[in-house]
C-alpha cells in the first residue's frame, strides 16, 4: 500500500472516531432549555432592539418567565403583549407609558457626511441599513424599527432619528384594536303545527 493511501484511511478513521465522540458528547451533555422561554421568544418580534431594557428578545423572554411584566416591548405592540399575557396567564396591561408616548422614529443617514465605516450596518439588528465599506449607507425606512442602536457607533455622528407621521402611504389598520363581539348561533326549535 502506498503511504498516501494509508494516510487518507488513517485520517478518515480519526475523523469518524472524533465525529462519533462529539455526537455522543452532544447527547450526553445536552442542556435542556425552558420550553416556556422558547414559546415567549417565538412570540416576541426578534428585533433585538433593547427598548424593553434587556439586550435582546431572549433575555426579555427569560425575564418574563421569571415574573417580569409583559408590557415592555414597543415593537411588538399591543397584539404581542396580549399573546404574552395569555401564555403567562396574567392580565394584559397597557403598553409601557414611555413606549406609548413616543412617536415612531426611523434612522436617517446624512449621506453626504457618511464615511462608509459600516459600524451602523453591524449595529442594526434587523438589517435595515444597506451600503458597503468606504461607500455611503442608507436606511430602508420600511424595515427600520427605530431602535436607535445605530446612532451611537457612528464615528461622524451622521445618523438622526426622525419621527414618522402617519399618512395615506404608511397608515394601516390596527385590526387587533377593533372591538369584535362573537355571537354564537343557537339551534332553533322546530315549530310544531
Curated annotation (Swiss-Prot):
Location of the 4Fe-4S domain: 32-90
InterPro entries: 4Fe-4S_dom, 4Fe4S_Fe-S-bd, 4Fe4S_Fe_S_CS, Elect_transpt_cplx_RnfB/RsxB, RnfB/RsxB_Proteobac, RnfB_subfamily
Cofactor dependency: [4Fe-4S] cluster
Highest taxon in the source lineage: Bacteria
GO CC annotation: plasma membrane
Region Hydrophobic, residue ranges: 1-26
Binding residues for [4Fe-4S] cluster 1: 49, 52, 57, 73
Keywords: 4Fe-4S, Cell inner membrane, Cell membrane, Electron transport, Iron, Iron-sulfur, Membrane, Metal-binding, Repeat, Translocase, Transport
EC number(s) on file: 7.-.-.-
Protein localization: Cell inner membrane
Presence of the UniProt keyword S-adenosyl-L-methionine in the record: no
GO molecular function: 4 iron, 4 sulfur cluster binding; electron transfer activity; metal ion binding
Domain 4Fe-4S ferredoxin-type: 105-134, 136-164
One Gene Ontology term from the biological process aspect of the record: electron transport chain
Enzyme class label: translocase
Binding-site list for [4Fe-4S] cluster 2: 114, 117, 120, 154
Cofactor note: Binds 3 [4Fe-4S] clusters.
Chain sites annotated for binding [4Fe-4S] cluster 3: 124, 144, 147, 150
Disulfide bond positions: none
Its job: Part of a membrane-bound complex that couples electron transfer with translocation of ions across the membrane.
Subunit structure and binding partners: The complex is composed of six subunits: RnfA, RnfB, RnfC, RnfD, RnfE and RnfG.
Family membership: Belongs to the 4Fe4S bacterial-type ferredoxin family. RnfB subfamily.
HAMAP family, sorted: RsxB_RnfB
Protein name according to UniProt: Ion-translocating oxidoreductase complex subunit B
Organism of origin: Shewanella sp. (strain MR-7)
Protein's gene: rnfB
Amino acid at each position: 500500500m502506498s503511504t498516501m493511501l494509508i494516510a487518507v484511511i488513517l485520517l478518515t478513521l480519526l475523523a469518524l472516531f472524533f465525529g462519533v465522540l462529539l455526537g455522543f458528547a452532544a447527547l450526553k451533555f445536552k442542556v435542556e432549555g425552558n420550553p416556556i422561554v422558547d414559546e415567549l421568544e417565538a412570540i416576541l418580534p426578534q428585533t433585538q432592539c433593547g427598548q424593553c431594557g434587556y439586550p435582546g428578545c431572549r433575555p426579555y423572554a427569560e425575564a418574563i418567565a421569571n415574573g417580569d411584566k409583559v408590557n415592555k416591548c414597543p415593537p411588538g405592540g399591543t397584539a404581542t403583549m396580549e399573546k404574552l399575557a395569555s401564555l403567562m396567564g396574567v392580565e394584559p396591561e397597557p403598553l409601557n407609558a414611555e413606549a406609548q408616548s413616543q412617536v415612531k422614529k426611523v434612522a436617517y443617514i446624512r449621506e453626504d457626511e457618511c464615511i462608509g465605516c459600516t459600524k451602523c450596518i453591524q449595529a442594526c439588528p434587523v438589517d435595515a441599513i444597506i451600503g458597503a465599506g468606504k461607500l455611503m449607507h442608507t436606511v430602508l425606512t420600511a424595515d427600520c424599527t427605530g431602535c436607535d442602536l445605530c446612532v451611537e457607533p457612528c464615528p461622524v455622528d451622521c445618523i438622526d432619528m426622525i419621527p414618522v407621521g402617519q399618512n395615506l402611504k404608511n397608515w394601516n389598520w390596527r385590526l387587533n384594536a377593533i372591538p369584535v363581539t362573537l355571537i354564537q348561533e343557537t339551534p332553533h326549535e322546530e315549530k310544531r303545527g
